[in-house]
């Protein structure tokens, strides 16, 4: 039959949330690399190729290990099991993630008091995107978000502070970050 858009294309201009990402097969996760980089997904079926838009923000959640113990001292997994549990998240995929945040059980607890309504947050996000689009439009760039701006343009026309570049260069030289990682930091 005719190829149909999947989750990646349906998340176009939005968020693709993968819960329990470490449980997703490695080839599936690695299949996200091209759409994250190129902003589209290409499907080839029966001597026919279809391209669907796929510019999305990827958000993944994963426990640090299979037992998911809230208190690390109560974890039943050995170090090898913990390392293997997150091995589905390949280096090249991690390299395409803008941020990686580790939450402790206490930090992950949601405090309902003072919590904002989703509609209020959505309005702030929409306003921020409008400001970003106007800023880039003034520079002749057709981008709605910082993530869509070509890295070469950012390095040339909107360089980061010298102290930040010195730090990023040191991380790059030590192999703690890749050039793609440096570009991602500049876009943040």
Regions found by a protein language model. Name each.
Residues 18-19, 43:
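Thr-Gly-centered strand-to-loop micro-motif
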Residues 13, 19-21, 31-32:
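Walker B catalytic acidic pair
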């Amino acid at each position: 039959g005719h190829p149909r858009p999947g989750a990646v294309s349906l998340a176009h201009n939005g968020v693709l949330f993968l819960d329990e990402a470490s449980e997703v097969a490695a080839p599936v996760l690695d299949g996200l690399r091209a759409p994250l980089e190129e902003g589209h997904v290409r499907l080839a079926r029966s001597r026919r190729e279809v391209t669907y838009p796929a510019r999305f923000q990827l958000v993944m959640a994963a426990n640090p290990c299979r037992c998911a113990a809230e208190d690390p001292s109560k974890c039943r997994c050995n170090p090898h099991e913990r390392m293997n549990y997150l091995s589905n998240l390949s280096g090249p995929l991690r390299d395409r993630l803008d941020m990686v945040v580790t939450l402790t059980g206490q930090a992950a607890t949601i405090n309902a008091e003072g919590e904002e309504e989703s509609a209020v947050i959505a309005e702030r996000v929409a306003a921020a995107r409008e400001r970003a689009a106007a800023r880039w439009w003034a520079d002749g760039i057709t981008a709605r978000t910082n993530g869509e701006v070509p890295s070469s343009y950012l390095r040339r026309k909107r360089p980061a502070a010298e102290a930040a570049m010195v730090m990023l260069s040191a991380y790059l030289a030590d192999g703690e970050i890749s050039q793609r990682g440096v570009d991602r930091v500049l876009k943040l």
